[in-house]
Each structure stands twice: as C-alpha cells, then as structure tokens.
Amino acid sequence: MKYKTLVFGHKGYPGFANWFWATRYDWLRIGIFVSEEIQNKDSCLGNYLRDAISNSVDTGRDWGPKYGKFFYTETPYGLKSKSIMMRGHGYKLLVIDYENDKILEIHSIAADYKPQILIPLIMQ
C-alpha cells in the first residue's frame, strides 16, 4: 500500500477504535449468532457472553442499567426477559432476547424516534 490514512473522530480517537460498519442483514446475522452462542453451554463465545452478563457494571442509565464487554446486559429498556443490547450512533440498536429467541434490529441514523416506547411494544 503506497498511501496510508488514519482517520480520527471528533474526540480524537482513531476511527477504527469506535466504529463498526455493517448492513442491517449483517447486524441481524450477528444477533442470531449471539443468541445461539449465549445459550450454548459448551461454547467459548457463549462463556464469554455469560461472563459479560454476570460481571457487568452499573451505568446509571434507565435504558441500559448494566454494561459489560460491548453489551448492555440487564433489562434494556425495561424488558422483562433475559436480554442484551448493543447500541450505536443515532440509536442504532440490536436487542437480543435470548430467553424467547427474539431479535430486534433497528438500523437508524436518526435519534428522534422513541426506543423506550418502541422496544417494549415490539418485544413484549
């Protein structure tokens, strides 16, 4: 490669450190994969995810009270079932209800919708 470029975000972090690019189908595949792995007791990744849940730390946020290893791990948006969530820029959300085998992927760049209303309504 003749030229190398490193992109930095507005807070000074390298671009590769805080962004993950994927299509909505990629996100859905990630959700399915995570849901299957978290339920597999013999899976190394499943053990990693269960460890993220059991060792998550308090966030002080109503919509995601605990966080561990890139996942909000306890009752995201007040869901009653065992669920984890990834959240990104513009309220990009991946909610994985691994107790009831449900996945909600919201591929958004606009933060003006109301996930606190939408998510419990869809995932109930």
What residues fall within each predicted segment?
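Active-site helix/loop module of the DD-peptidase/beta-lactamase fold
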Residues: 1-22
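Active-site Gly/Thr loop motif
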Residues: 2-8, 50-106, 111
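Stable alpha-helical elements in mature extracytoplasmic
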Residues: 23-27, 45-48, 118
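Short, gly/Ser/Thr-rich active-site loops of penicillin-recognizing serine hydrolases
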Residues: 114-124
